[in-house]
């Protein structure tokens, strides 16, 4: 089991909290709650996500996911977080900083999902606001990017409420639910962040 244990210090141990939420890296002990929330939210999430692998919600699939997460964190490529309500430990959703680029770029791409029972209640806006100081602070990023399907109004609102600027449209940018879809591109610079 040590294979899936993430370091207790350094970037892998990031666990920002605030406004009643805790964000931390996924652990094997999260499997049951994660699989239940994803399964119960499948119809809600499907229009906005890539096609799920056939074994995505299995324990073995979750183990592979954790292994990949550990490798990505160690290589400074990606930082996944599960979002919990702090008062009762309820899992709300997840946020991942992916495609981390260093050197002269110092940027990464944010993606997120929220379980259907917690959608449209401000949880993801709050979670992103809690995470941004960590991304600009501890991870020392200059720029955070995001992309969303133009019809995903709730996601657009999350980004705009968190200070992201709409920067353009990327045609047929990502394969979502089996279809290459246009995406609005958003960015947030460190100097524009009011954390």
Can you name each region flagged by the protein language model?
Residues 71-76, 164:
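Short loop/turn motifs at secondary-structure junctions and domain boundaries
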Residues 68-72, 134:
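A generic secondary-structure signal
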Residues 46-67:
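Conserved GNAT-fold acetyl-CoA-binding loop/helix
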Residues 1-33, 37-47, 80-195:
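Acyl-donor (CoA/ACP) binding surface of acyl/acetyltransferases
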């Amino acid at each position: 089991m040590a294979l899936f244990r993430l370091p207790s210090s350094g970037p892998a141990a990031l666990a920002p909290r605030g406004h009643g939420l805790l964000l931390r890296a996924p652990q094997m002990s999260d499997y049951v709650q994660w699989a239940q929330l994803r399964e119960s939210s499948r119809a809600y999430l499907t229009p906005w996500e890539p096609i799920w692998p056939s074994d995505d919600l299995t324990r073995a699939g979750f183990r592979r996911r954790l292994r990949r997460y550990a490798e990505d964190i160690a290589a400074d490529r990606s930082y996944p977080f599960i979002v919990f309500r702090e008062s009762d430990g309820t899992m709300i959703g997840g946020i991942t900083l992916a495609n981390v680029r260093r050197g002269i770029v110092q940027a990464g791409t944010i993606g997120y999902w929220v379980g259907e029972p917690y959608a449209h209640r401000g949880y993801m806006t709050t979670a992103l606001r809690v995470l941004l100081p960590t991304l600009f602070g501890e991870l020392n990023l200059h720029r955070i990017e995001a992309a969303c399907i133009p019809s995903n109004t709730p996601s657009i609102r999350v980004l705009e409420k968190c200070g992201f600027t709409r920067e353009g449209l990327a045609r047929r940018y990502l394969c979502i639910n089996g279809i290459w879809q246009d995406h609005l591109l958003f960015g947030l610079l460190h100097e524009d962040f009011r954390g």
